[in-house]
Amino acid sequence: MPSASKNFRLQSKYVFLTYPKCSSQRDDLFQFLWEKLTPFLIFFLGVASELHQDGTTHYHALIQLDKKPCIRDPSFFDFEGNHPNIQPARNSKQVLDYISKDGDIKTRGDFRDHKVSPRKSDARWRTIIQTATSKEEYLDMIKEEFPHEWATKLQWLEYSANKLFPPQPEQYVSPFTESDLRCHEDLHNWRETHLYHDEGRTGVRHPSLYICGPTRTGKTTWARSLGRHNYWNGTIDFTNYDEHATYNIIDDIPFKFVPLWKQLIGCQSDFTVNPKYGKKKKIKGGIPSIILCNPDEDWMLSMTSQQKDYFEDNCVTHYMCDGETFFARESSSH
């Protein structure tokens, strides 16, 4: 007998039960269910047996009530030590066809052809999508509300779950050691003061860092070697945003294609983003960004004077000199 569950609640006039590997007699189970549900004005009951290949017997039951129950005890339907799987019957005709496929079924009462309307079904799906907070919870809610879809379309449901709740990517590990790289004194000061700062200092908005320089000089390699970060190249998508990162990297993305640039550059906290194929979410933020670009896509050339004012107030700007590189060894070519 399962332990009591505070979360269990059955409020459906149409119920589908399955008793796996049950050694009881079908007629005894039938009589038990009919008497148990009489207070709820039962008007149809069907109990069918199914012989599995392993030689065990499963019993299925379709229950139709005239009065909606509110059952909080998960052991309510337990019979002779057998606990059933309990599901709302979304489509009574479909359930009846399924349980009677072997022909061994006992019924009583007048069957009603019932199924959830498409509008109500859409509303249930919408609720699941809007309220689930993780992939596991999303799939569990579907299994509870739509067991048939869960059993027959799990592969597609997992695909949608991964879109809504994408797995966190593996943390980047730099292939270079600290001795392989070097940086300008200004960048060293920014790193030590604003990136490797004392985390106990709260309420401080640290400036971001803007580096504009030629290709193949090690800008990306150096930036990615500094610690745990979010990395965006080509486009910004918050789907896999890492809340535990200590900084962001915006690499080779033109200024006009950077959404929420003030929030990212200004080290702002608690702002709402809209990931691709996902639902809006609030991210903690509060971390600086490193912007990397080549001279042909210098952000300053695309900004208005007001945008430049905000940018310069919230960002340390570094234009690389001729011959400047982030590699300490000439043999490096990344």
From Swiss-Prot:
GO molecular function: ATP binding; DNA binding; endodeoxyribonuclease activity, producing 5'-phosphomonoesters; helicase activity; metal ion binding; nucleotidyltransferase activity; structural molecule activity
Subcellular location: Host nucleus
Main location class: host cell
Cofactor note: Divalent metal cations, possibly Mg(2+) or Mn(2+).
Binding site for a divalent metal cation: E50, H58, H60, D102
Motif Nuclear localization signal per UniProt: ranges: 276-286
Name the record gives this protein: Replication-associated protein
